[in-house]
Amino acid sequence: MPKLSVCIEMFWTDLPFDERIRRVAAAGYSAYEFWGWRAKDLDAIRAATAETGLAVAGFAIDPGFALTAPGGEEGMTKAAVEAAGVAHSLNCKSLIVTTGNEIAGESFEITRRRVVRKLKAMSAVAADEGLRICLEPLNPFVDHKHYWLTTMAQAGDIVEEVDSAGLGILYDLYHQQLTEGKLINNLHRHLHQIGHIHTAGVPGRHELLGSENDYAALFRAIDASGYNGYVGLEFRPTIGEEAALAQTLTLLG
C-alpha cells in the first residue's frame, strides 16, 4: 500500500499550519508535507509534529532564486544548506525544488547547462546531509505557463548527468498527465530516480476519485513497482477536507 502524505498547503486553508497538521492526524493519515518554509512558524510546526507523531514527507527548498535564471549559484547553495537544517529539525529526508520559467531568447541547452551546474552544487549539500532533493517537472499548459522543465525524460536526463545520491525526481501524476500521459510507463522507466510522487484529479486538480487518472490502478502499479517513498495528496478538495481524505483511502483497495 502506498504511503500517503497530505499537502497541508491545499487543505484547511483557513487554519494555521500547526492546526492543519492536527487535522491530518485526526483524519487517520500518518504524514504531511508543505511548500516553502521561510514564512512559516517553524516552532509551532515542530510542536504539532511532535504532538501528533506525524512524519514530514517533504517540503520545498524555497531558495528565492530560479534554477533557470542567470546567477544566484551561491544563493541556491546557501538555500540548500538552510533547508537541510530545517529538514533535520523535522526529521524529513526529502526536499523539493522547481526550476523556474524559460529564459526568453535562450536555447533549452544553454539553460540546461546552468540548471545542471546549480543542481550539482545543491545535490552535493543534500548528499552530505543524508537528504535527497526532488526535481519537479510541471505542466506548462494549465498551471505553469512558460515553466522550463516539463517532461520526465528531461528530468531524468538531468538527474543522470548530475549523478548524485542527493538528487531525484518528484513525479507529479497530475502535471504529467496534462503534459505527456504514459503515467505507468514513466513510473517504471524512472523508478530508480523517483524520490517523491504527487497526485491530484485531472482535470481541475481536485479529488482523486472520478479523475481522468485512474488512481486505483495507479496506486496498484506504484505498490507493485516496489516504490517505497511517499505519495503526496496535492489537490484542492471540493467536498470538504475530511470527506476528500476519507474518499481517497477507498482507492487503496
Question: What does each model-found stretch correspond to?
Answer:
Residues 30-39:
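A short beta-strand-loop structural module common to alpha/beta enzyme folds
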Residues 1-10, 56-67, 99-103, 142:
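N-terminal small/glycine-rich loop or linker at the start of catalytic domains
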Residues 37, 100, 138, 202, ...:
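Flexible loop residues that form catalytic
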